[in-house]
């Protein structure tokens, strides 16, 4: 007897909708589109090419909408693709708008770099977050191929490590050697330690206390 395939359950992300009353009647928005009206972008997943493209598109839209108003980027991310993260980073520096960053939950790896890359004085964290910095990882469970190709990838990884360290150096004020030592292994910090290290500017508990 041939077993019949059973339908598999797939996780579906539930996206809330909000309804606003306008002069023309009711208008429905998914929550992320509604937040975008208030210049809020949410990075709540691992950093992938698709996520980067979406965030970059939102930043460009908000820059065109009003280049004088800041963009608010909320981050809860374990990190992800270095190239995708650097694409977001480059556009954070490219757009005319200030970019305020907010850590909620966790900002690890590329997530911490994006948190730190916010406009100086506008990098926030809630009090119970975790921030983690480390050197870039070689993706995949193993490495195979010609020795020459392995050497090429190893050299590229070293260049990437130096590039990321230099970016942290630019935004934290820490010297290169201190950062290199701090990033040698997974380095977890609470937000107060991250503030002391220069990764963020303010630890906030409520909107009533923006500076802490």
Swiss-Prot record:
Fourteen ClpP subunits assemble into 2 heptameric rings which stack back to back to give a disk-like structure with a central cavity, resembling the structure of eukaryotic proteasomes. Pfam families: CLP_protease. It is found in: Cytoplasm. PANTHER family: ATP-DEPENDENT CLP PROTEASE PROTEOLYTIC SUBUNIT, ATP-DEPENDENT CLP PROTEASE PROTEOLYTIC SUBUNIT, MITOCHONDRIAL. This is ATP-dependent Clp protease proteolytic subunit. InterPro entries: ClpP, ClpP/crotonase-like_dom_sf, ClpP/TepA, ClpP_His_AS, ClpP_Ser_AS. GO terms for biological process: protein quality control for misfolded or incompletely synthesized proteins. HAMAP family: ClpP (MF_00444). Disulfide bonds: none annotated. Transmembrane segments: none annotated. Belongs to the peptidase S14 family. It catalyses: Hydrolysis of proteins to small peptides in the presence of ATP and magnesium. alpha-casein is the usual test substrate. In the absence of ATP, only oligopeptides shorter than five residues are hydrolyzed (such as succinyl-Leu-Tyr-|-NHMec, and Leu-Tyr-Leu-|-Tyr-Trp, in which cleavage of the -Tyr-|-Leu- and -Tyr-|-Trp bonds also occurs). The keyword Cytoplasm applies. It comes from the Bacteria. PROSITE patterns: CLP_PROTEASE_HIS, CLP_PROTEASE_SER. Keywords: Cytoplasm, Hydrolase, Protease, Serine protease. GO terms for molecular function: ATP-dependent peptidase activity; ATPase binding; serine-type endopeptidase activity. The active site is at residues 109, 134. The gene is clpP. GO terms for cellular component: cytoplasm; endopeptidase Clp complex. CDD domains: S14_ClpP_2. Cleaves peptides in various proteins in a process that requires ATP hydrolysis. Has a chymotrypsin-like activity. Plays a major role in the degradation of misfolded proteins. It comes from Bdellovibrio bacteriovorus (strain ATCC 15356 / DSM 50701 / NCIMB 9529 / HD100). Its EC number is 3.4.21.92.
């Amino acid at each position: 007897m041939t077993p019949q395939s059973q339908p598999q359950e797939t996780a579906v992300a539930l996206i809330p909708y909000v309804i606003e009353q306008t002069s023309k009647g009711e208008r429905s928005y998914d929550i992320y589109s509604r937040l975008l009206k208030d210049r809020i972008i949410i990075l709540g997943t691992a950093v992938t090419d698709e996520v980067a493209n979406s965030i970059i598109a939102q930043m460009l839209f908000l820059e065109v909408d009003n280049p004088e108003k800041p963009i608010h980027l909320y981050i809860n991310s374990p990190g992800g693709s270095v190239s995708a993260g650097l694409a977001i980073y480059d556009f954070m520096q490219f757009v005319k708008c200030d970019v305020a960053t907010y850590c909620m939950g966790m900002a690890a790896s590329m997530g911490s770099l994006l948190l730190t890359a916010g406009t100086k004085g506008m990098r926030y964290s809630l009090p119970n977050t975790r921030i983690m910095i480390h050197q870039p990882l070689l993706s995949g469970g193993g490495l195979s191929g010609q020795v020459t190709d392995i050497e090429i990838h190893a050299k590229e990884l070293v260049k990437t490590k130096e590039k990321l360290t230099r970016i942290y150096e630019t935004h934290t004020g820490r010297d290169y050697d201190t950062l290199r030592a701090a990033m040698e292994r997974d380095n977890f910090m609470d937000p107060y330690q991250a503030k002391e290290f220069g990764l963020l500017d303010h630890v906030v508990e409520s909107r009533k206390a923006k500076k802490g």
